[in-house]
């Protein structure tokens, strides 16, 4: 069988697609996968290094822009649609999966015109504009969080979770088997691959209020390149034991090590921390489209599987107080971590591939 995966732009869209591709290829050595994205998206940098085939088309957003920009976006959509039809005719996929991002729309619309089975996967609590539009032409809609179900037709929507790449799943399993080797309280702070400037600043402001816990607090803080020197200086000035890095190579090891995590609330982060069963203080990125990170975090909060501080209420003292309270309440930390792990769907990629393959058999 052949699977075409369309979309990307960001890691939050692309990496679930890679996880599905891994599962699909593992089913049969004869299976083939082709990605369709854009030259500007993260897929153009990541996929060539992984060995996956990638075809790039022209695509752009049209939402919330002026009339001229919308006209240009529509022209690019039509051009991308024509490119997608050509790719579909040449690759002749049995299945097409849209994972969100600009390239999804023209590709799935072209697949509809050619009567190829179509599926979409939504990673966030509030669906993106592209997936809301494509829901009308999709044969099945896979969702990561229950909250997004209301945006889609009930009879076509299936809760699968957010697929994690095999590398992450294997690292998590390996990390769980390792002993940590000390009795300190380990705090992990990170903001995605580029870091999160506001979290970096606020953590520095929180340090004076955490001085009483300095003796047993061990911190790993991933800052991104821009704030690395300033954050390192802040920890040194306050006398804290901290491993401050621009980028973390093995997130699974970092998760294993942590008793508590301070982080953003992107869909991939949620999938990974729940897979590891780790309690988190989520600080949602306030400028995410439709404020979806806040809704992602609230999805865990209402299930007792995480804590949330919104940026409008964030300060050094507020963050320090939250950390102190949780350091002093190990039973609560354990309960929240267990609740998070109950929400994990380690079989998300399997569930999606199962459903796509089963759908084609029904048509036969």
Swiss-Prot record:
Pathway: Cell wall biogenesis; peptidoglycan biosynthesis. It is a peripheral membrane protein. This is UDP-N-acetylglucosamine--N-acetylmuramyl-(pentapeptide) pyrophosphoryl-undecaprenol N-acetylglucosamine transferase. It is an enzyme of class 2 (transferase). Belongs to the glycosyltransferase 28 family. MurG subfamily. CDD domains: GT28_MurG (cd03785). Its main location: membrane. It comes from Geobacter sulfurreducens (strain ATCC 51573 / DSM 12127 / PCA). Its EC number is 2.4.1.227. Keywords: Cell cycle, Cell division, Cell inner membrane, Cell membrane, Cell shape, Cell wall biogenesis/degradation, Glycosyltransferase, Membrane, Peptidoglycan synthesis, Transferase. PANTHER family: GLYCOSYLTRANSFERASE (PTHR21015:SF22), UDP-N-ACETYLGLUCOSAMINE--N-ACETYLMURAMYL-(PENTAPEPTIDE) PYROPHOSPHORYL-UNDECAPRENOL N-ACETYLGLUCOSAMINE TRANSFERASE 1 (PTHR21015). InterPro entries: GlcNAc_MurG, Glyco_trans_28_C, GlycoTrans_28_N.
């Amino acid at each position: 069988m052949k699977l075409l995966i369309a979309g990307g732009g960001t890691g939050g869209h692309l990496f679930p697609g890679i996880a599905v591709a891994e599962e699909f290829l593992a089913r049969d050595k004869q299976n083939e996968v082709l990605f369709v994205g854009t030259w500007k998206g993260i897929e153009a940098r990541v996929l060539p290094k992984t060995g996956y085939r990638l075809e790039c088309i022209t695509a752009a957003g049209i939402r919330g822009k002026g009339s001229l920009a919308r006209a240009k976006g529509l022209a690019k959509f039509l051009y991308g649609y024509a490119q997608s039809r050509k790719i579909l005719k040449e690759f002749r996929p049995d299945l097409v999966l849209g994972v969100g991002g600009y390239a999804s729309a023209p590709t799935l619309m072209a697949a509809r015109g050619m009567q190829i089975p179509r599926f979409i996967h939504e990673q966030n609590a509030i669906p993106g504009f592209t997936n809301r539009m494509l829901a009308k032409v999709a044969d099945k809609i896979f969702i990561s969080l229950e909250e997004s179900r209301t945006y889609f037709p009930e009879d076509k929507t299936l809760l699968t979770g957010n697929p994690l790449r095999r590398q992450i799943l294997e690292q998590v399993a390996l990390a769980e088997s390792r002993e940590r080797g000390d009795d300190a309280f380990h705090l992990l702070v990170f903001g995605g691959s580029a870091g999160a400037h506001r979290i970096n600043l606020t953590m520095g402001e929180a340090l004076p209020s955490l001085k009483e816990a300095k003796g047993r607090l061990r911190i790993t803080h991933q800052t991104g390149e821009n704030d690395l020197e300033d954050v390192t200086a802040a920890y040194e000035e306050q006398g804290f034991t901290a491993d401050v890095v621009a980028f973390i190579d093995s997130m699974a090891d970092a998760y294993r090590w942590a008793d508590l995590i301070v982080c953003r609330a992107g869909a991939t982060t949620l999938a990974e921390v729940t897979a590891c069963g780790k309690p988190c203080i989520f600080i949602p990125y306030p400028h995410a489209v439709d404020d979806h990170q806040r809704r992602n975090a609230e999805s865990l909060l209402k299930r007792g599987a995480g804590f949330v501080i919104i940026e409008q209420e964030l300060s050094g003292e507020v963050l320090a107080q939250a950390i102190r309270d949780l350091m002093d309440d190990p039973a609560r930390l354990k309960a929240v971590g267990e609740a998070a792990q109950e929400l994990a769907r380690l079989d998300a990629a399997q569930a999606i591939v199962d459903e796509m393959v089963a759908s084609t058999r029904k048509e036969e």
